[in-house]
Design a protein with these regions (language model features):
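Bacterial Sec-dependent N-terminal signal peptides
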Residues: 1-32, 93, 124, 407
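Blade/loop signatures of beta-propeller domains
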Residues: 20-56
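Beta-strand-rich domains and repeat architectures in extracellular enzymes and scaffolds
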Residues: 38, 50-85
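Blade-loop segments of beta-propeller domains
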Residues: 57-63, 67, 95-122, 130, ...
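Structural signature of eukaryotic scaffold interfaces centered on beta-propeller domains
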Residues: 67-73, 114-121, 159-166, 209-224, ...
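Asp-box/WD-like beta-propeller blade repeats and closely related beta-sheet repeat scaffolds
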Residues: 129-180, 195-207
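Conserved blade-ending motifs and adjacent loop-strand segments that build the rim/top face
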Residues: 249-271, 325-359
Length: 407
């Protein structure tokens, strides 16, 4: 009898050990588990180095207001899209290379430019215009046009963004009471390869309560040539494989902090509910995301008011980083007022948060020249940072911040 009991205990223990040794699902982003554990995160924890690269300023290349932070870095070139839809290109060292503005109604021009994307192999620029995508070389030469509205099915949808992946295009569509599709994969002839539907249960809520639209818009981002799709408040981030099939790339666990789309008070500024907002960026090791956290924040961020209005306001969003290799999720505290992101502990610069992540593993953002100079005057910075500031004029072009991320 004693032997039987001993065997039973060993069997139970073995089962428990095996259960505890189950491999961790590295797709799971435990947002709920990150609440109450926010901390300052140093840039050196996720990066190898940082560079500040002033963009050359001359009569041909005066960078105006950048259109919704549309900045890219691929193939050794920086691309900035201005508010007037001019695309200004500088090389790896910040030297002016070219300026492209093909605004017009000709067959090789764009009548509008809603956004752009960069071909990761050639460095060519593709522009999303009305009903078509036009591609130009770095020199500004016309390469080709893809009239996606030639596809009768696509002509019924309003395209807001796109990602060019090799010879394919993923088009992000708005959702409304006439269309439940959040995106389409097409080839270079506008042939439809794949449609991505907005989740049915969420779609019904969005079309019933139009006020939710701005929160529940679908989002796309990329990791190299992989297209990622996030449908509103849905917990899944999808990815499109090379064979045009769809897989789950990541799964959010919002737990008790998941908002109910049918309860409007869940979306008030200080509501204690979490949802993914703004744009996500991804490198080989990290996923960078911003979430509404409302009153859940350990230390709410403070930002300066704009438009000549003095004072501060509570910024009810928190930056975060997810380590794809360890499965660790971390909310990031604000380093100081009016700054968001990682503590810049290499040269003493301001906090760093991506506006782009390149296919070769660089986090990219930028600073206006007058802001760069002001930071050098009010903070303890390295000799290198101060030297760059001393050689800038307030009216110079922006300074690119290029961070080499760890792999």
């Amino acid at each position: 009898m004693k032997k039987l009991i001993l065997i039973f205990i060993i069997a139970i223990t073995s089962c428990q050990n095996n259960s505890g040794n189950q491999p961790k699902d590295l797709r799971l982003i435990d947002v709920e588990g990150g609440v109450g554990k926010s901390r300052l995160v140093k840039l050196s924890e996720i990066a190898e180095s940082i560079e500040y690269i002033p963009l050359e300023t001359n009569s041909e290349a005066v960078v105006g207001k950048i259109f919704f932070d549309r900045i890219f870095y691929e193939k050794g070139f920086f691309y900035l899209m201005e508010q007037n839809r001019t695309i200004i290109i500088h090389d790896n060292d910040g030297k002016y290379f070219n300026k492209i503005n093909k605004l017009g109604r000709g067959p090789q021009e764009y009548d509008a430019a809603f956004t752009v994307d960069i071909d990761l192999k050639t460095g060519n620029i593709s522009v999303l215009a009305s009903n078509k995508i036009i591609e130009y070389s770095l020199d500004g030469d016309f390469k080709k046009v893809m009239n996606y509205k030639d596809n009768g099915f696509l002509s019924k949808h309003y395209i807001t963004r796109f990602i060019k992946s090799d010879l394919k295009y993923f088009l992000l569509s708005t959702i409304n009471d006439r269309s439940q599709h959040s995106g389409f994969l097409i080839d270079s002839t506008a042939r439809l390869l794949l449609s991505v539907e907005y989740p049915g249960e969420d779609y019904e809520k969005v079309t019933t309560y139009s006020a939710l639209l701005s929160i529940m818009y679908p989002m796309i981002f990329r990791h190299k040539n992989a297209v990622r799709i996030k449908n509103g408040l849905n917990k899944y981030i999808l990815t499109i494989n090379e064979d045009n099939s769809i897989d789950t790339a990541y799964i959010f666990n919002f737990g008790k902090y998941a908002p109910d789309p049918l309860k409007r008070d869940h979306f008030r500024t200080h509501a204690p509910f979490i949802w993914n907002k703004f744009w996500n960026f991804e490198s080989d090791q990290y996923l960078f995301m911003t979430f509404h956290t409302g009153s859940l924040s350990d230390k709410p961020a403070k930002m300066f008011r704009k438009g000549g209005v003095e004072g501060e306001y509570d910024y009810n969003f928190e930056c975060s980083v997810f380590n794809k290799k360890t499965g660790e999720f971390q909310f990031i505290l604000q380093p100081e007022i009016n700054q968001l992101g990682f503590v810049e502990d290499f040269e003493g610069g301001p906090a760093v948060w991506p506006k782009y992540v390149s296919s070769d593993g660089y986090m990219i953002t930028y600073m206006d020249a007058h802001e760069f100079k002001a930071h050098a005057e009010t903070h303890e910075v390295s000799d290198k940072f101060k030297s760059i500031a001393d050689n800038l004029k307030d009216t110079d072009n922006p300074v690119i911040v290029r961070v080499k991320l760890k792999n």
